[in-house]
Amino acid sequence: MHARLGLNVHRDAWPTTAVLAAYEAAGFAWVQVHTPPRAMLSERRQGLRHARALRTALDGTGLRLLVHAPDDLSAGTIEHDRAFDGLLDYAAAAGAELIAYHGLNFAEADGPAAARLRERAQLEERSLIPLLQRAHSLGITVAIENLAPLYPGQARRCHDPLAVRDLVRRLDSPAAGMLLDLGHLHITADATRSDPAAVLGACAPDVALFHAHDNLGCRRSIDAPGVDPIKLDLHLPPGRGTLPWARVAGIVGAHRTPVMLEVERSYRPALDVLAAESARLLLLAGSAAAAA
């Protein structure tokens, strides 16, 4: 078993006993499951029912749990803060150790709209402080993720990994860390012509979780057979795209945090092959590079 390696359950799927057993047999130690929508987290009753069923499914395995918050959850309003509080209840009931959260998920803007963006981001940050205090009391870490555009389009504040890292540092909470998504980093670094290894190195001390998947960067007219011709965030298996794994493996391999694979089902090889190849690219090669 690869103690740091995990695999996502697709947001539309339920982690059945057979699915979880297959993950464990392939060598994964972690599983990521998406929570119900915001409204159900706010309402509590249905959310907790879902969480308890998830815990029951996991109890027959040795898999450790990470839950992914709803993509549209952004602390900073009464409605969203209530849902975030329900998210913490959900994670505790399900026995999750980590929550993946999309912080700073606001469109970039100029002029008067820029002031509104700053205000909304400040409201989120203010709300996260007591929510993180509660997360800490529950033994849960909230990992805030750098994102990337699914298709070419408007930039969002969360597309800047350093902005996400700086939010984590300002929060200064033992229950807050960065979720460094390597696939997203590849897209945004390619778009800005930045060095992904340098950005990764600047963020590494604050990372509590990695997401790993591959893509073709911001594409720049690059195409490949068998994949969507215009999508950026392809979620290919590691090694199937153009992400420079050899340049990031040293930092990832030397880290102690989990590495969660998020691979689109239509591109996914056999689970044992996916686990072995991902471990070779990231964990084993990275550990060797760190020791050299």
Where are these regions (language model features)?
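Histidine-acidic metal/acid-base catalytic patches
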Residues: M1-R4, A13, T17-G27, G95, ...
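Hydrophobic residues within beta-strands of alpha/beta enzymes
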Residues: V31-V33, I99, V142, F210, ...
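Aromatic/hydrophobic pocket-lining residues that form the small-molecule binding cavity
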Residues: T16, G47, A51, H80-L87, ...
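Catalytic-core regions built around general acid/base machinery
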Residues: G47-T61, S127-A135, L167, A198-A202, ...
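Active-site beta-loop-alpha junctions enriched in small/polar residues
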Residues: N8-D12, H34-R38, P70-S74, L104-F106, ...
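Active-site acidic/histidine proton-transfer and metal-coordination neighborhood
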Residues: G60, G76-G177
